[in-house]
Amino acid sequence: LPVEERMDFVSIVTPNHMHFPPAKMALENGFHVLSDKPATFNLKEAKALEKLIKKSKCLYGLTHNYTGYPLVKEARHMVATGKLGKIRKVVVEYPQGWLATRLETTGQKQAGWRTDPKRSGAAGCIGDIGTHAENLAEYITGLKIKELAADLTAFVSGRKLDDDGNVLLRFTGGAKGVLHSSQIS
């Protein structure tokens, strides 16, 4: 189809293991891509995706949906204009409780793929929702995490991936922080 009749971009909102194949196909066919995180399932796919983006000259966007919320934008503005002073401590959390039991054994689709390393990837809760907390911490403060120490746990017996995570953070500029994400809270 002529460009004026084609869709503008491809949106990828599939389980994690299915992000790269449609992105690859779209980029190879000249479509811009907007994808849920993670961009890829592993480093090999990430390197291939980077090459595809450069070769295609198409735009590629990765969604971090909470940065668009008005209160988040206001918090970022308050930090940027100095209304909160110098940031010394960052506390960010994303607690959930929906995986407090082995919901994945009941046929619930979301729980099924999110707790399966073959479909979700190597990280469970920390990759699923901890990344949103990390993104908010950096986005709002304007600081970058330079070091971390993580304690990831699978509290639910038989679960293959973490369902709870606590992370100590050190940011550029000297600030320190704590990130808590949990799907069993």
What are these regions (language model features)?
Residues 1-7:
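A structured beta-alpha segment of the ubiquitous adenosine-cofactor-binding alpha/beta core
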Residues 9, 89, 176:
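Short, Asp-centered acidic motifs that coordinate Mg2+ and/or phosphate
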Residues 9, 15-67, 82:
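Beta-strand-loop-alpha-helix segment that lines the small-molecule cofactor/substrate pocket
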Residues 14-15, 181:
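Short glycine-/small-residue-rich Rossmann-like dinucleotide-binding loops
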Residues 34, 59-61, 91, 149, ...:
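Structural detector of well-ordered beta-strand residues that form the stable sheet scaffold
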Residues 67-159:
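Predominantly a Rossmann-like dinucleotide-binding segment in NAD(P)-dependent oxidoreductases
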Residues 152-162, 172-185:
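NAD(P)-dinucleotide binding in Rossmann-like oxidoreductases
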